[in-house]
């Protein structure tokens, strides 16, 4: 019996929510291990639709424990708001179904403000952040000046920690010509939310180790996608954390040998939100058609996603950098009815052929996709639940993707409904 890590194999928005929800039915514990409330996902459970940004998917499922690990940066007010929103939908979040790492870094209002100032004040060099303070909070974590969840339980220790934090942030604010923030303002912000979030704190690394030793099935839920990884993504147009599967260990406190099966999620085409290179992006009516059929708008921001053909080079890179054992291929039904479908198999950069996207930002901008054209299919894949339900050419398309990325398709999703899934291999039974 394996534990399972779910990671996005592209630039996020791959449909992880549905796959995690489908897998969480078999899991005892669901763990968030990186990111913050900057990436959302939609869960469809029966007739109910839940939109989560910070809470693990397990909290909406009975008898499943949701865990927010130390690798997550936590906005305590966003957490309280999301808990209240679920309560309005009839889902009670308590210590019985949610624990938060006591050493998780907190996102404060000054982080959100700094994030927005940088993004709005950088014409032509925007990264495409959600302005929710994720990056600045990670900066403070690495700079060893962050306020952590456990600090709220010891209010008498907060003043010197706030003083250290503001020594940095007020210097930045002076540079922006902004009024400095007082220590009392931050203290009030922290003490005002403490009683809402402290009941969930726990020593998560020990909790997860006990669960593992007790034979519990643990599902690690990644946010964003591996191509947004701060090291392995299209830097600097990336998120502020590691999003590859290895972060599941670091961001939860569980040893790397306990991670188990790595399931990568990839769309049957490619999308991206915000700025950054996108070799297969389509600016024509085909790209518009894919976006409209796939309802490609961000869960958190509502931003329109950029759309393009499937990029086998990028997913193949992700298979290697995340150690992916199998792929869940989503939104195959969006490609129904295309006469032909193109897949990027290599790049041409200044006359030289590359089988991967170089780390150089300049080279990425000059990368021209080399395509293989595959016949489309006239039948429908929407709602298919077995191979027998799929058009023959759709099966050929899936098999060709497997060959190009060097990993098998373990699950195939054919609609947003959780049961419209074709299972080839159950990751928990690896």
Curated annotation (Swiss-Prot):
The cofactors it requires, by name, are: Mg(2+)
User: Which subcellular locations apply to this protein?
Assistant: Cytoplasm
**Pfam families recorded:** Adenylsucc_synt (PF00709)
- UniProt main location, coarse: cytoplasm
Q: Which SUPFAM superfamilies match?
A: P-loop containing nucleoside triphosphate hydrolases (SSF52540)
Q: Which reaction is recorded as catalysed by this protein?
A: IMP + L-aspartate + GTP = N(6)-(1,2-dicarboxyethyl)-AMP + GDP + phosphate + 2 H(+)
Family label:
Belongs to the adenylosuccinate synthetase family.
Q: What name appears for this protein in its UniProt entry? A: Adenylosuccinate synthetase
**Per the UniProt entry, what species is this protein from, by scientific name?**
Methylorubrum extorquens (strain CM4 / NCIMB 13688)
Q: What is the lineage of its organism?
A: Bacteria, Pseudomonadati, Pseudomonadota, Alphaproteobacteria, Hyphomicrobiales
């Amino acid at each position: 019996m394996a534990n399972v890590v779910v990671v996005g194999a592209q630039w996020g928005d791959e449909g992880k929510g549905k796959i995690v929800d489908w897998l969480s039915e078999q899991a005892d514990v669901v763990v968030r291990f990186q990111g913050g409330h900057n990436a959302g996902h939609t869960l469809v459970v029966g007739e109910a639709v839940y939109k989560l940004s910070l809470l693990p998917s397990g909290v909406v499922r009975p008898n499943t424990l949701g865990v927010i690990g130390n690798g997550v940066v936590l906005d305590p007010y966003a957490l309280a708001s999301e808990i209240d929103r679920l309560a309005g939908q009839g889902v009670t979040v308590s210590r019985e179904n949610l624990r938060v790492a006591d050493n998780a870094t907190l996102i404060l209002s000054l982080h959100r403000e700094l994030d927005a100032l940088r993004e709005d004040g950088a014409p032509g060099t925007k990264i495409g952040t959600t302005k929710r303070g994720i990056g600045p909070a990670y900066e403070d974590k690495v700079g060893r000046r962050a306020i952590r969840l456990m600090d709220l339980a010891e209010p008498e220790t907060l003043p010197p920690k706030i003083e250290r934090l503001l020594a940095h942030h007020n210097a930045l604010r002076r540079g922006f010509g902004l009024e400095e923030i007082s220590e009392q303002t931050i203290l009030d912000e922290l003490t005002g939310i403490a009683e809402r979030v402290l009941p969930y704190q726990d020593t998560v690394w020990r909790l997860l180790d006990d669960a593992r030793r007790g034979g519990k099935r643990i599902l690690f839920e990644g946010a964003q996608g591996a191509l947004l990884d701060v090291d392995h993504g299209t830097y600097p147009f990336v998120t502020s954390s590691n999003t590859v599967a290895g972060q599941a260990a670091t961001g939860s406190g569980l040893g790397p040998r306990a991670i188990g099966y790595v399931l990568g999620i990839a769309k049957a085409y490619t999308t991206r939100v915000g700025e950054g290179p996108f070799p297969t992006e389509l600016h024509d009516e085909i790209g518009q058609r894919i976006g409209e059929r796939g309802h490609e708008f961000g869960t958190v921001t509502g931003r329109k996603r950029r759309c393009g053909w499937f990029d086998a080079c990028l997913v193949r890179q992700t298979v290697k950098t995340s150690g992916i054992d199998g792929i869940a291929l989503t939104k195959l039904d969006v490609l129904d009815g295309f006469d032909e479908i193109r897949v990027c198999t290599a790049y041409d950069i200044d006359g030289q052929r590359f089988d991967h996207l170089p780390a150089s930002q300049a080279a990425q901008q000059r990368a021209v996709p080399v395509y293989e054209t595959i016949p489309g299919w006239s039948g429908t894949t929407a709602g298919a639940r077995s191979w027998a339900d799929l058009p023959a050419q759709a099966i050929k398309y899936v098999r060709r993707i497997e060959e190009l990325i060097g990993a098998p398709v373990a699950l195939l999703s054919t609609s947003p409904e959780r049961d419209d899934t074709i299972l080839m291999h159950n990751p928990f039974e690896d």
